[in-house]
Amino acid sequence: MTQELTTPGASAPGASSETTTRVTRALLACGVVAGPLYVVVALLQVLSRDGFDLSRHPLSLLSLGDLGWIQITNFVVAGLLAVAFAVGLRRVLHPGRGGTWGPRLVGGYGVGLVAGGVFVADPALGFPPGAPAGIPDQLSWHAVVHAFAPPLAFLSLIVACFVLVRRFAAHRQRGWAAYSAATGVACLALSAWPGQDGLSVRLAVAMVIGFAWVSVLAARLLTDPAATGSVHAELQHASTKTARRGRGPT
């Protein structure tokens, strides 16, 4: 494979490859951080916010009240990190099966998270304290937009899992194919299961499962790109050989 990674302004093939690799690794690292950051911040709020009950209240209601800015920031930062990871994922997987739509769908997941933070839900189900005990009869415009954010995020992530199943299977990465399929099925079952009983808990569990997949995939690509059928390792090897030829014998 002779394709060469290039970065505008680089003075030599070796420098170009090194710069591109650093940027790609930084983007992949965003995926590693996104999941643990979101889960830890959300969990701390679940345990500490007065009146919040995960068995009744979805995590998006944490965006309300005096401390709502914490969850808003959590949504937005985690979403932006997921979008950054999607850019890095495309650098690693493209070209090839799933190298276009896999990253795009992961990016859609990130966009859904950002939208969920920017457009907050209306007070409901008694949270924050003093809010109506039920669901408001009429939603605000931002609550209507917010209502589309979770489906966008979950659907994008679920489809991304199955898109990458095909890639991993084609590269005989059976473990990754099985893990991606299991993640997609679990997130679909938890988020689409009929009935409102336990919905907020199911969505929270689906969020943890989905973010775990993103973080584990990002970590694996950072440590061993070839393990997931990545062409990045081949490109880096080819660029290194080119740089060595350019330096000549020592």
Regions found by a protein language model. Give the residues of each.
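Actinobacteria-biased recognition of intrinsically disordered, low-complexity terminal regions
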Residues: M1-L27, D224-T250
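Hydrophobic, aromatic-enriched alpha-helical segments typical of multi-pass transmembrane helices
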Residues: T19-A226
